[in-house]
């Protein structure tokens, strides 16, 4: 049986935004629990409060079964077909960045008086500054983080001292927290770092020298809690790797 992780703060953020006429957008790093929040915790809240399941319309755009619906010419007519009466409908749309022309589509749904739209979005297309401009004031962001220590303890079987050691070692990514062995946790973290987080940074910022970026991240990760001096880092890269990276470039990459 999969343990339930409590995300009460974020659930409350969605609940208090119901019916506000805006597009509720859950953002955050990959694997921090956005899909679970929307399609499990929030959906259960709706059902427990009397919402008919037929009035909860779900779509996970990352599933292969739904790949055709990434085309707005397929998805939008399908979405309208789900609206059968004047009662309120809740649209819970997961990984909506995979939907082509998602801004126009979401605005179209939000324009309907009996539609309440909630979505999750990952990667480069859903930074806070982009939401403010792309949605023209109609996007209402709920930014989600990995598990806090109290959330971590909601699914940890041991005492708080052992829990703290586990938490500061492996962090609060739910998938990692629920892994059973240290080896599984390390493999998951390594895969997330290499295949997901690095990939997003490189794609969004069109970085050509990926190896240099990875080296910088290794240096920063080894000095957490210490002051960062871009000029010293630049000299280190020059002496160790004979790199031509500038202090200005290092500053920009830290800001990524």
Could you describe each region identified by the protein language model?
Residues 4, 150-256:
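Interdomain hinge/linker elements that couple catalytic modules in large macromolecular machines
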Residues 84-102:
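Conserved P-loop NTPase "ATPase switch" module shared by AAA+ and STAND
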Residues 35:
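Walker A/P-loop
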Residues 1-15, 19:
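N-terminal pre-Walker A segment at the start of P-loop NTPase domains
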Residues 116-122, 143, 152:
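Structural recognition of the conserved hydrophobic beta-strand(s) that form the central parallel beta-sheet
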Residues 125-141, 155-157:
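Short regulatory helix/loop adjacent to the ATP-binding pocket of P-loop NTPases
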Residues 26:
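Hydrophobic anchor at the beta1->P-loop junction of P-loop NTPases
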Residues 57-87:
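Short glycine-rich substrate-engagement loop in P-loop NTPases that contacts/grips substrate
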